């Protein structure tokens, strides 16, 4: 049985851990509020965002004078617990506050890029013709916003029978790959494509 002193020590430790967690959660809420306020200042044209090359851009620099039809949303794409600002209209940008500066984390295409928060990344999917083909690649984000690009997967209806099947061409980073391996490696991407109707 636990003595009175051991019980007091356990209670003190629980209070300390609980206090640390409360401070951590409060700090995260404050960080999220400050970050969201900074995002709004960017959207209002008050502050610029910086690309990795050091150049700064206001919203109008990225999308032109008329920004009325620019889609914006918040999503924690890198899994750090703080939401990033996603803005798109033809071009797709993700902004994150890094080291006290609003930084453009990602630049892609709004037509082909699909955010997948559960996987901390962006799925690129595109269909093409002559012959029919599909391209997939996934860019994952580390918690600090660092991008990790995955392989590019392509399949071609090389026999031009109107469907991707056994006799067709499967590539991984431009190198022919066995259909079974290709299907296994792209299974999650194809499931996302089908689920979201891409």
Predicted regions and their residues:
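Hydrophobic residues embedded in beta-strands of well-ordered beta-sheets
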Residues: 92-93, 102, 121-123, 146-147, ...
């Amino acid at each position: 049985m636990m003595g009175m002193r051991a019980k007091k020590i356990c209670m003190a430790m629980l209070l300390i851990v609980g206090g640390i967690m409360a401070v951590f959660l409060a700090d995260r809420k404050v960080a999220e509020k400050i970050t969201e306020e900074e995002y709004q200042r960017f959207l209002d044209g008050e502050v610029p965002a910086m690309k990795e090359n050091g150049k700064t851009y206001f919203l109008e620099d990225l999308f032109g004078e008329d920004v009325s039809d620019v889609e914006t949303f918040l999503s924690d794409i890198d899994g750090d617990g703080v939401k990033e600002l996603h803005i798109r209209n033809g071009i797709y940008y993700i902004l994150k506050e890094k080291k006290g500066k609003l930084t453009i984390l990602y630049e892609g295409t709004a037509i082909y890029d699909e955010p997948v928060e559960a996987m901390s990344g962006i799925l690129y999917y595109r269909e093409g013709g002559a012959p029919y083909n599909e391209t997939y690649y996934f860019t994952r984000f580390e918690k600090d916003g660092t991008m990790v690009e995955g392989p590019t997967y392509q399949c071609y209806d090389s026999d031009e029978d109107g469907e991707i099947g056994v006799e067709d061409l499967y590539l991984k980073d431009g190198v022919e790959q066995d259909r079974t391996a290709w299907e296994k490696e792209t299974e999650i991407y194809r499931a996302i494509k089908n689920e979201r109707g891409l």
